[in-house]
């Protein structure tokens, strides 16, 4: 039995008083003080961890103004505040103690657009890709690019002055901010914009906080103008935080306070709204993907690409390329970046040309390609080949692979992981190759592996050395390397932070600004935040305040993780290796990962949130001397005793009375998971939440009773075959309002599905498929066996959607084969989902033995439902290891592909069909949709794959009363609107859960694609 974890970092009373004051004064947002909520805000995409006191989620600028006004009261003057956006920073920019003000949950509205004047007004929590999705129909986009664009907020981009691919042409975020609405501590609101310096001088006369700020900034930037121009490097990625260089125009006639706030990392004010300029979408885009024999060749060839008038040049090294090959993303780009025969591709330059003049763009590209042909022919420059990509979909796929690079590095094998701390250095592009030679030598001298990729056109290369932050010696080495890189960038006239902001690296600021200008930064900080209460420790401290800065060698996630025994860390690597890249925060409702995060907006209910809580739970167990691995080994031998039941009942009673146990907070996070497994493939780190979730649930319920619904779900494969013997009787009762009400209230289950009537056996009555025994099959000759197909049943299609299985039997026959319906053998998936792992192991072992025996016949085994078939491949291998054997159960499309491979495609006739893929299937088998389309093409039909997220059913998740609203809400995100615009009779879905959800909500369901094929053949 696991112990109670009753201790959690407490809350300061004044923090609770502040939150109560917010509530009393009409705050419309959310507040959070649980340990779980605070832990999810304690990390970002960096190596650091800092636990905040509380989190607030304002809904409007008025809410932020209320926070700031109350913060200005004397009783709360000891509290500090840190604004937070997407939480994707790589250097802890938004991490702090104190109160986190999260702008991402609610403040995500696009407020106004003026196409004629070319601007848009947004709230700070709007996500970059969300804005571009909105702008696309107008023919515009917000041009600063970054790899986390599908989860990074514009407020975060502004606060770090973010930039990325294409910055040589498009510049940094600050180049596109026309004005900001910001709230100062005390509640005063200011609106910034570029204005005549004379007007700024007038504002500076006001005896307000705004007037004080204008006076200070005007005076300091004028007085130190010559030194500013001397010290600030003339780079595309110019020095920010604070951007003294661009406050005044070159002729000193224009003043823009916006430039001070962009890149300020929330140290000066709360930015709540922004007016941004927007850029027309280029009418023509072309990519030339240039392949090299080495990364050094790619680097040294990059300046030539820039001279060829390219919009951007992105470089990727062999380490990143090889990791991409092992990821789900590679199937989408492997034809666009194909290997060169007899050559090894060890470097790649992605060169983009874009504009409105097709002839000009094509001419620029052809000039480059001619030069590349010469280099290849002469075997110079390390160029081994290139490919051109001219279609927008292909271009987006390549950039998605490039954007995933940072996450892919985190999936490198071993304890040492490539980490960010010197990953966005910037030097003049002409010095980049030489700079990288020295940088690589530094890392090689310490025998470190590393991955490199970046924006070589701008002189920015992302370098991530692999270090184990659980090893104190390597933690010290990280600081040593960081210091050396600072000196190296200075040597080449560059910057340590060319893209991602300073964060914990602000301690190096004096070395780049110089002491005089650094003092000016402190004066400006004092004008905005004299008491050092906004994100303290970042950028600089106010001039009159003697406060320490955050340090590069501050407390890291590894400091906490190393308290967990190595064996436990290794066993739970699915949780421990989360690096916070945040891809699970993707705003796009069509992305399958993660439906619970999308519907709740609560990061506890994301793979990152769940991984964070489990790693802390493991640490707290270790603190009490508890080994979860030993407990897991003991469980199969344990038997339920009266004493144990009494103890569990007592523990559960105390829990119901409010007795604290951190395990309850972890359980709450795990209960929201749909177990769709999208994270296990879509996450670049392959964080497998359903895997460690089932292990947690098993251990949690050694201490606490299970709800009745858990037993009902886990036993579905035991009682369903029995009920199916009298489906009309059971369906009669299932339709009764009183039973449905009792099911909801007593068991916690809703909308229970009706059993198939007629049953599968009745539909196939007398059919040869149901009469052959295993012994008879074993007696068949090799020739006879080649004619047979063995259908592996699952409980859902066989008993609740039997016509699909019956139709598959007919389809197999129509294709000239003899189907055989194998006896039903429980799969155990539901047991795994609910954490009955001991029972699941028994089920899996028994079924694996049966399927291994059947597999020896040499006949194909085919299952209908993707989730159940994939369970044989994943969960069975995980729980049984080598005992699983080597049986293989194919999905319907996999078998069809093999059987009709030599059948020629036929001209498509009639309306297209539309395929809605199952989440588990489309993420585990990303080519499945295209494979179904190819199968349909061979029968003269067109099949289009529909891009949707999760349907919200996920096995029994949608039938549990506590999940009902989320289940319906998830369906509304993408499935409902998509189905409304398509002809229902042409829509198809491979998953039983998906078809069941459509039928429940829409009233009439959709068919399995095999049924459409059968219809075509018949």
Please identify what each model-predicted range represents:
Residues 529, 536, 690-1018:
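Iron-sulfur cluster-binding electron-transfer modules in prokaryotic oxidoreductases
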Residues 546, 550-581, 585-723, 841-847, ...:
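Ferredoxin-type iron-sulfur electron-transfer modules in oxidoreductases and energy-metabolism complexes
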Residues 157-159, 163-250, 254-325, 330, ...:
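Mobile "lid/hinge" segments at catalytic clefts and subdomain interfaces of large enzymes
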